[in-house]
C-alpha cells in the first residue's frame, strides 16, 4: 500500500469531472460557429415563390457569399387565413435576413432597406408613403392633413380638410361640404 492521498473512487459510466465543462464549452463553441444570429444584409434574387407563401431567395454575402439562400419565409406584422399585409420586395431590392434559431437552413426575410438613392420622394417624419414600382402611391401627410392616392397615369384623389379633389393633371373636380367645382369653377354646383 502506498502512502499519500487516496484516489477518489472511479465511476466507469461518468467521464472524469474535468472533461465535462471542457466538452460543454466545446459544444457551445461548435454551436456558435455553425449558427448565424442577428440581421444580415441581402439582395433579392428571386421572388417567384412556387408555393405562393411570400418567400424570396436572396444573396447574403456575409453568410453565403454569392450563393442564393434557400426560400426565406416572410416576417410580417399581420397575417392569417385570407387576411394580412402582403408586400413582396422586387428582385434587386435590399432586404434584411435572419435565420430561425440561427440555422441557415431556415432563412427569414424581416424587412427591406433603401440604398442612398432609393428613398421615395417627399418622405419626412410627418409624411408616410407606400409606393410601388408602377408607380402607384398612397401618401399620408400628417402636417398637411391630407391623404393622396396617385395611380400610374398621374391621376390623383386627395382627401383633406377642404374636401375631395379628383385630378388627371389638366382637369379636376373638387367636392366640398357646400359645392362641387369642375375645372377651377368652370362649372359650379352649390
Stretches with model-predicted labels:
Residues 177-190:
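Long terminal segments
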Residues 2-175:
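Hydrophobic packing positions characteristic
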Amino acid at each position: 500500500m502506498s502512502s499519500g492521498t487516496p484516489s477518489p473512487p472511479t465511476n466507469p459510466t461518468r467521464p472524469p469531472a474535468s472533461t465535462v465543462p471542457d466538452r460543454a464549452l466545446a459544444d457551445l463553441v461548435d454551436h456558435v460557429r455553425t449558427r448565424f444570429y442577428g440581421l444580415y444584409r441581402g439582395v433579392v434574387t428571386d421572388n417567384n415563390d412556387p408555393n405562393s407563401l411570400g418567400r424570396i431567395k436572396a444573396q447574403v454575402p456575409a453568410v453565403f457569399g454569392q450563393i442564393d439562400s434557400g426560400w426565406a419565409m416572410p416576417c410580417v406584422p399581420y397575417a392569417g387565413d385570407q387576411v394580412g399585409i402582403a408586400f413582396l420586395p422586387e428582385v434587386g431590392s435590399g432586404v434584411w435576413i435572419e435565420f430561425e434559431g440561427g440555422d441557415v437552413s431556415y432563412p427569414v426575410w424581416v424587412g427591406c432597406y433603401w440604398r442612398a438613392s432609393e428613398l421615395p420622394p417627399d418622405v419626412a417624419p410627418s409624411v408616410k408613403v407606400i409606393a410601388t414600382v408602377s408607380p402607384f402611391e398612397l401618401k399620408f401627410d400628417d402636417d398637411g392633413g391630407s391623404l393622396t392616392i396617385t395611380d400610374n397615369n398621374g391621376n390623383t384623389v386627395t382627401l383633406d380638410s377642404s374636401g375631395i379633389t379628383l385630378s388627371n393633371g389638366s382637369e379636376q373636380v373638387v367636392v366640398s361640404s357646400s359645392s362641387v367645382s369642375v375645372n377651377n369653377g368652370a362649372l359650379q354646383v352649390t
